[in-house]
A protein has these predicted regions:
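Charged, terminal alpha-helix-loop-beta segments
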Residues: 1-266
Length: 266
């Protein structure tokens, strides 16, 4: 089995040529093009197409050294379709992130400060995704290995339309839903692209995800080998930590004050 460092070294040699060719100037032009789409209130499908051809706009969410590809148009059975998805690795082990792209012309809140119909619909859809994963756990894990409690991202509306009162309501809403939903305006991608361009060094970008995202068919064919290695190593580490926790708990129980065994206890 490869180690994390070995997987990173191998990934570094696999940077997509389209990513290697990126320059700060090209990224500025890409960001301007995406901003024009937002300003023209382009259809969701147009935004999805652009993002599917410019994976680095997700660089603020996906670890730069992540081995997981970014997938688009992932179908959850015959019921739902997720705009984008990837497998995320953190201290708690691997878990999936699911993304819903909504209309840039939609408001986040009504004039009375309540979640708009567009935001309410998007949040319900995210909850439906999570419910589907739980109700079809075996099937879901065949498609997306390790999926259990996915975190759903919603991108909707524009930052300029968010009032101070809306901002406070959004903070509360995000806190209340933090275990299952994260909400951003579509301008989040603009900022992510800008930061990516500013971070391009003399050796070029270090973004290891293909420029053009993968598809449902790719996902059905299984995770790439390096991702499977990361999953296996993460599971091994978690099992080792779990065994250590169990041993510590047993030691604590066996050595609790007043509970030491005597010869007559044996």
């Amino acid at each position: 089995m490869k180690t994390f460092s070995a997987a990173n070294a191998e990934n570094a040699r696999k940077i997509d040529p389209l990513i290697r060719e990126l320059t700060s100037k090209k990224v500025v032009a890409d960001v301007a093009e995406f901003t024009r789409l937002l300003d023209s209130k382009a259809r969701e499908s147009k935004l999805q197409e652009f993002l599917a051809s410019h994976s680095y706009f997700f660089s603020g969410m996906i670890d730069v050294y992540s081995p997981s590809p970014l997938y688009a148009k992932v179908k959850l059975g015959h019921d739902y379709e997720v705009d984008f998805a990837w497998l995320y690795f953190d201290s708690f082990g691997p878990e999936w992130r699911l993304v819903e792209i909504e209309n840039p012309g939609s408001a986040l809140f009504t004039k009375s400060g309540e979640p708009s119909s567009a935001l309410s619909h998007a949040m319900q859809q995210a909850r439906d995704w999570c419910a589907w994963v739980h109700d079809h756990a075996e099937y879901a894990r065949k498609l997306m290995p390790q999926i259990s409690h996915p975190l759903c991202y919603i991108f909707l509306g524009r930052r300029k339309d968010v009032t101070p009162a809306n901002r406070e309501a959004l903070r509360k809403l995000r806190y209340d839903r933090r275990s299952e939903i994260v909400i951003h305006t579509l301008d989040w991608f603009v900022r992510s692209g800008q930061v990516f361009g500013q971070c391009i060094g003399p050796d070029g970008p270090t973004w290891q995800i293909p420029m053009k995202v993968l598809t449902q068919r790719d996902l059905k064919n299984g995770l790439p080998e390096e991702v499977q290695d990361w999953v296996a190593e993460a599971q091994s580490k978690m099992m080792t930590e779990r065994r250590l926790d169990q041993r510590r708990a047993k030691w604590s129980r066996d050595n609790e004050p007043g509970m030491f065994k005597t010869d007559t206890d044996i």
